[in-house]
Amino acid sequence: MITIVLLILAYLLGSIPSGLWIGQVFFQINLREHGSGNTGTTNTFRILGKKAGMATFVIDFFKGTLATLLPIIFHLQGVSPLIFGLLAVIGHTFPIFAGFKGGKAVATSAGVIFGFAPIFCLYLAIIFFGALYLGSMISLSSVTASIAAVIGVLLFPLFGFILSNYDSLFITIILALASLIIIRHKDNIARIKNKTENLVPWGLNLTHQDPKK
């Protein structure tokens, strides 16, 4: 019974639409009506500012981490922490508290990985910020980190680097999360190809995007 309760709790944690609620409560702004219409970290930064964007990221990240740690906190046996983390990501993407219309799963997925394999998460953070500096696009960085996650989980155990052994469930979860993130960014990918993707005011913009085009 406790397992079912905690699995439901993991989904509910993921379903907390932090950006949407922060906008409505503190700014009287519905993020769905502004910018990209997304309720995640990037649109929150763009529409509501740095403080709101950072708060959204922290909440979205650590709700994934907390969900992943639930079975450890409650000394639950028999169900991998990754299953709880996956449910949090599903909740974030399809939140019951926001009409099942959620974010793009990046921050919460990162939080899940941090809760299960923190050094692997650090590797992905380096990839993410490296890609962000080179391309000046959150979307490109997210997709790049997703691809790097798949490459890492498949190759690193072979060399005993960061991941000491192959974990079939971890590989499956990484493949699922990476696929979800890439699918959720399909519109962004199209804009990147057309050189019209939104930029952040940092980095080299080596792909020469022109969002005003």
UniProtKB/Swiss-Prot annotation:
InterPro entries hit by this protein: G3P_acylTferase_PlsY (IPR003811)
Pathway: Lipid metabolism; phospholipid metabolism
Molecular-function GO terms, alphabetical: acyl-phosphate glycerol-3-phosphate acyltransferase activity
UniProt superkingdom: Bacteria
Compartments in which it is found: Cell membrane
Pfam families: G3P_acyltransf
Catalytic reaction(s) noted: an acyl phosphate + sn-glycerol 3-phosphate = a 1-acyl-sn-glycero-3-phosphate + phosphate
Keywords, sorted A to Z: Cell membrane, Lipid biosynthesis, Lipid metabolism, Membrane, Phospholipid biosynthesis, Phospholipid metabolism, Transferase, Transmembrane, Transmembrane helix
A GO CC term attached to the entry: plasma membrane
TM region(s), chain numbering: 2-22, 52-74, 81-100, 112-132, 143-163, 164-184
A GO biological process held by the record: phospholipid biosynthetic process
Membrane topology type: Multi-pass membrane protein
Assigned EC number: 2.3.1.275
Role according to the record: Catalyzes the transfer of an acyl group from acyl-phosphate (acyl-PO(4)) to glycerol-3-phosphate (G3P) to form lysophosphatidic acid (LPA). This enzyme utilizes acyl-phosphate as fatty acyl donor, but not acyl-CoA or acyl-ACP.
HAMAP family: PlsY
PANTHER family linked: GLYCEROL-3-PHOSPHATE ACYLTRANSFERASE-RELATED, INNER MEMBRANE PROTEIN YGIH
Record-stated family: Belongs to the PlsY family.
Assembly description: Probably interacts with PlsX.
This protein's name: Glycerol-3-phosphate acyltransferase
Name of the gene this protein is made from: plsY
